[in-house]
């Protein structure tokens, strides 16, 4: 768990923002949500495969030349 030292005369909101950023950087919340309920190995493989296909499609779409507009 990330630890944040609150500096002297630092507002609570700023310290809270730094803490949230540190938690987000470690990926703690995403890991917690993933472990919240059991996911069957086949479901996990299927989800990861779908995410990989989606990433590939996005990469190909960004590399593709735009259609001619004339």
Swiss-Prot record:
It comes from Neisseria meningitidis serogroup B (strain ATCC BAA-335 / MC58). Keywords: Ribonucleoprotein, Ribosomal protein. Gene3D superfamilies: Ribosomal protein S8. InterPro entries: Ribosomal_bS21 (IPR001911), Ribosomal_bS21_sf (IPR038380). This is Small ribosomal subunit protein bS21. GO terms for cellular component: ribonucleoprotein complex; ribosome. One of its GO terms (molecular function) is structural constituent of ribosome. Signal peptide: none annotated. Belongs to the bacterial ribosomal protein bS21 family. Present in outer membrane vesicle formulations which are used as vaccines in human. GO terms for biological process: translation.
């Amino acid at each position: 768990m990330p630890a944040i030292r609150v500096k002297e005369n630092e507002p609570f909101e700023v310290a809270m923002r730094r803490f949230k950023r540190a938690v987000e950087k470690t990926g703690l919340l995403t890991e917690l949500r993933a472990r919240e309920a059991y996911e069957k190995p086949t479901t996990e493989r299927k989800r990861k495969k779908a995410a990989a296909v989606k990433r590939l499609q996005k990469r190909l779409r960004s590399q593709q030349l735009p259609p001619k507009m004339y």
